[in-house]
Amino acid sequence: MVHAKSWTLKKHFVGYPTNSDFELKTVELPPLKDGEVLLEALYLTVDPYMRIMAKSLKEGDMMMGEQVARVVESKNSAFPTGTIVLAPSGWTTHSISNGEKLEKVLAEWPDTLPLSLALGTVGMPGLTAYFGLLDICGVKGGETVLVSAAAGAVGSIVGQIAKLKGCKVVGTAGSDEKVAWLKKHGFDVALNYKTVKSLEEALKEAAPEGYDCYFDNVGGEFSNVAITQMKKFGRIAICGAISVYNRTSPLSPGPSPEIIIFKELHLQGFVVYRWQGEVRQKALRDLLKWVSEGKIQYHEHVTEGFENMPAAFIGLLKGENLGKAIVKA
């Protein structure tokens, strides 16, 4: 008899989520049917997109999300007991799956790397950085790249891939600690956007000739300013808008249409799940190789204990994490 603990949405968020918006429930799972497996969560992820996706949940629904899990009981020959998988099981300690949405961790995964990276640098955030920079922005060596939220799970990888491709990289973050981390890991310029006297002047000083590519993780007023610093024919990959996800007032106006028109800018939003099949597997292998070779550095902000899922999520939205926010079950 297995009891699963699950975090559910008690009430919809108003502004930043609070602990009282969540409720921890325990349910008894049924015996396995043929073709099913029982999963036990090892690591769980919290990500900004959950703030938006939670709007589509009904109160009482379990919070969504991926986890690295171990198969602890199996009636499915494709996933024997002990298999490590990525599972979209949500915020739960145990779950039952028929195997259709499970993904085994790469066979070549070395013992020297933590499995939690499959939720970060060698997972969805890493893939977001990879495809957003290489496919959407299409960066080339010698170009100048601006990355907002550069010390986050996605931005930190964007900047390092851009350096691997021979680009000049300017990153912005919200604390001096994060700025120091960016400088340590190869960013040519790193700025604390909260303390610069003028964001426009700071971005201009960092790249007087402008930016070829802007990887946008924050949206809002920051991005309105960043767009003014783009070169003609600049490309903007719109990945996220974390600066406005928790707003309680109307959204402020977007960037000036005149700038977009006369600079002939290309702005494109994207979601990483567009890339599937072999192209996705190649990207995962590339990311794993770069991490294994030390060409990409990672940092995890690990919260211990499944009971602290809400706190980890709230901290992420408030920018308390450096690198990927992970919960160790």
UniProtKB/Swiss-Prot annotation:
Name listed for the protein in its UniProt record: Prostaglandin reductase 1
Reactions catalysed according to its record: 13,14-dihydro-15-oxo-prostaglandin E1 + NADP(+) = 15-oxoprostaglandin E1 + NADPH + H(+); 13,14-dihydro-15-oxo-prostaglandin E2 + NADP(+) = 15-oxoprostaglandin E2 + NADPH + H(+); 13,14-dihydro-15-oxo-prostaglandin F1alpha + NADP(+) = 15-oxoprostaglandin F1alpha + NADPH + H(+); 13,14-dihydro-15-oxo-PGF2alpha + NADP(+) = 15-oxoprostaglandin F2alpha + NADPH + H(+)
Main location: cytoplasm
Localization per Swiss-Prot or TrEMBL: Cytoplasm
Gene: PTGR1
Annotated positions binding NADP(+): 152-155, 178, 193, 217, 239-245, 270-272, 321
GO molecular function: 13-lipoxin reductase activity; 15-oxoprostaglandin 13-oxidase [NAD(P)+] activity; 2-alkenal reductase (NADPH) activity; leukotriene B4 12-hydroxy dehydrogenase activity
Function of the molecule: NAD(P)H-dependent oxidoreductase involved in metabolic inactivation of pro- and anti-inflammatory eicosanoids: prostaglandins (PG), leukotrienes (LT) and lipoxins (LX). Catalyzes with high efficiency the reduction of the 13,14 double bond of 15-oxoPGs, including 15-oxo-PGE1, 15-oxo-PGE2, 15-oxo-PGF1-alpha and 15-oxo-PGF2-alpha. Catalyzes with lower efficiency the oxidation of the hydroxyl group at C12 of LTB4 and its derivatives, converting them into biologically less active 12-oxo-LTB4 metabolites.
GO biological process: leukotriene B4 metabolic process; lipoxin A4 metabolic process; prostaglandin metabolic process
Phosphoserine: modified positions: 20
Family (UniProt): Belongs to the NADP-dependent oxidoreductase L4BD family.
PTM-bearing positions, type Phosphothreonine: 18
Residues the record lists as N6-(2-hydroxyisobutyryl)lysine modifications: 178
SMART domains: PKS_ER
Keyword Electron transport set for record: no
One CC-aspect GO term: cytoplasm
